[in-house]
Amino acid sequence: MSSDQTPQNRNRGGDDSYNPRLQQQTSQIPSTGPDQGQQRERSQEQESDHEHQQAQQHLHQFQQSNLTPSTTAFPSSTSIPTFSKQDQGYHNQFSSPQSSYRKIGNFAQSSNAPFLNEPHPIYATNYQQNVPSQSQFQFDYSSPYIGQSQSQSQSQSQAQPQPHPQPQTYQQLPHYSQASVSSLPPTYQAFHSMHEASSADNDSATNITTPQKRKKQKRSESVTPNTGENELKQLALRSSNIPLSELAQKVKQLENDSTTTSVSLEQSKMKENKETQRQLFGMVWLLNSCDLAPTAVIPRNRIYARYVQVCADNNLAPVSPASFGKLVKILYPNITTRRLGMRGQSKYHYCGIKLTGDENMQSQLLNYQQKQKHQSQEQYNQQAQVGSSTSSAGLAGHQSPMSSCNSSVSYEESPGPIISRAHTPSFSPINTPTISMSKSLNDQLPSISHMKFIPNLFYLLNSNVATSSNPHEPIQLPSIYPYLSKDADHDIADTLYSLYKVHVNSIFEALRYMQLKKLFSSFSTFNNILTAPVLKLYTTESLAEWVMKCDLIMYKKMIRMLSKLQLQLLIPQEQLLQLKQIADGYIKTLSTSLINSKVSQNFVMMKLKLAKHFVNLLNRLIKVIETGQPASRILNDDNEKNTMTQDWMKLDIHGIICREMPCNDNNIDTLTYILTGEVVNLIKVKSDNEQAPTMSDFANYISNLPSRFPEVNTRLFLLLASNLLTTCLREISLSGGEGFGAWWIVRCWIDEYLAWSFEVGGFFQDDLQEIVAQQQLNVQLPPPSLSSLPQTQQQNPVIQEETGTQEESLGNIDLLETSFDFDAKTSQPYQQPSHTESLLNFETNIDNLLN
């Protein structure tokens, strides 16, 4: 049989007798005579005989195949039926696509019945009401779609059954009882039982998988996989009397131990213990800060904001909001959570719990906000008065900006408006004719090309001045409330303030203890802990300036801490390599985290601008250390200093100054005295009774040279000093001096150290501008002499002992407490035995420095 003669194709219109639409059309045409009726009967009889033969062939192939289900589909081989014409009529009725394929499609595709893939007749399963008993296979195939003449011809030949055309719409067949199924032949009963079994299996599988998924979700919501909720709750109840500071110290100790542990098993145990201690810290705080109250209602984010604030005060990273909510449910399982508030401004609230002293905290918050507004208004008035008075005084000057001793640090080369924003005036140097106010805080930060000379800069940085950037003091961020909009949520703002404080402290601590992995991962950790409302507030335009101020405070503390390393010439190469890795990967890591967080372009540029300035200063410090190490060996070697002195005495200093340094007579005299007298006295070999200068003496003398020329601009001084040294080295080289190599190494260090001191001065000019103004106007300090420099340097260790409060046990290295150089009051001329003794003391005093 061809594909066009299959029952499916005939039902789709392959034959006119199986097309209901054509049958309806033929019913409207009157009969033309008995000849046409007889021809139609003969064609139907031939067609039914052909189908009967085809069915016999299918059964024969079915019996010969290896997949014959002798025990499943048929009771025995003798029970395979032979189809008569009546059976063929039954087959035609239930083999249409609408009745059979719709109901047993799943069974035909099941792996339990692969023999159904063979081309054999397919039978329906739900057929009880339309099927008579096995002995009655006479069906009435009359249809309302068949015409009158056609129905008369069918009544004359009832033994000739023809298929009944099915309607075009699908109908749900009714469910049949087991009694009606038993009246069917065994073959059909077998097919029905197999279909019912496969359907039951599918239904049971569907019913089983759904509860399992829910159980997995419930397991994932457990607090910890190793410690049960009851054990954690009992541990928190027993630890409720322990101070939070002790718990926080234990968590930080575990965090530091996990960074130094190399074994994977021990590291995993440390991590699990650390997470347990962090959860314990949160639960102890909940027990001490929250009380049960049946009528109390409090916003859920307010409790989390107070918890994050406590973590920030103890310099501890908080858990995520979801994990904190689980801790609340463990301690207080009977409280409920409801969403309350106006439409569009509703929040989730805890019902049945309250914060102790929350009313007093809210009143203090309102008073603090009013105080901040009052202080900002007073600051605006004072800065406006200072700007007007300074601008009027500066107009009386006659010097040019490029010739003054101080330069403007505004990013914009062209002057901006006289007054822009009250809290962002750029620092204006003294004795400049014009005052330019920057448009925003972005312009206030000095770039690499804006430098400033501050007398006794590093002495001031090592003292207690400018506590906001003092690395020994905790980081205090500016208030966030003046930068909030009117409709901002203060609980979310408090959460952001505390989270960012923790973030800034974590970066500073990672650099302090040289934990590079923690430093680079802190950016992504901060982005992951921010919820959607906090992230939205964090990236708003109004808070960009607050974020910039916070980052600027952090970078100032970091540079102030790193400035101690400028003369610590015994720093190990491992730590120097780590500083290089930070300088190389800091910008890349920060930019990647900002791009992944999908913040605005202006926000990204602001963050990267500050980070780039920090990296530039760090690179300059690395160059100072690298050039200072060989320079210190030369300046502490008597033979090298004798050779350098002999070559220097051969130079025509007065001729070089007149040719290379165009300046007035006073500056020529001062410069001649410095090069012919002070430099020679500084590098010549001392007698046994005299104390040789140290590297700190050389550094302080060089950094205070610009104070001898107050009219020269800082950048101009740097260029002229480099040009003068280059000319002197060229003359030494042309004369064949043996000390050319030593002078070249020392000259490289002088260039780097001068640039470093000027860049650091420009970076901290806002913090030290009041002290600089006092020095310039009232109590200007004289340039330190060689005899007074060691006394100045002696005060630094005392200050560090008073302000240093951190424990050295938290890390292998502490940049605040560790010293890599000789003490100034016990410094001796650099010789090989002295160096060996100092290195021995260095390795003895610093525990685990080189792991």
From Swiss-Prot:
Record key words, sorted: DNA damage, DNA-binding, Nucleus, Repressor, Transcription, Transcription regulation, Virulence
Coiled coil: none
Name of the protein: Transcriptional regulator RFX1
Annotated Basic and acidic residues bias: 38-53
GO biological process: one example: regulation of transcription by RNA polymerase II
Bias (Polar residues) ranges: 1-11, 20-34, 85-114, 199-211, 384-393
Compartment list: Nucleus
Low complexity bias (residue ranges): 54-84, 141-170, 783-797
GO cellular component, one term: nucleus
High-level lineage: Eukaryota, Fungi, Dikarya, Ascomycota, Saccharomycotina
The protein's role, per its UniProt record: Transcription factor involved in DNA damage responses, morphogenesis, and virulence.
DNA-binding region, residue range(s): 282-357
Family: Belongs to the RFX family.
Induction: Induced during biofilm formation.
Region feature (Disordered): 1-121, 134-170, 195-230, 368-411, 783-806
Gene3D superfamilies assigned to the protein according to its UniProt record, in alphabetical order: Winged helix-like DNA-binding domain superfamily/Winged helix DNA-binding domain (1.10.10.10)
GO molecular function: DNA-binding transcription activator activity; DNA-binding transcription factor activity, RNA polymerase II-specific; DNA-binding transcription repressor activity; RNA polymerase II cis-regulatory region sequence-specific DNA binding
Organism field: Candida albicans (strain SC5314 / ATCC MYA-2876) (Yeast)
Gene name, Swiss-Prot/TrEMBL: RFX1
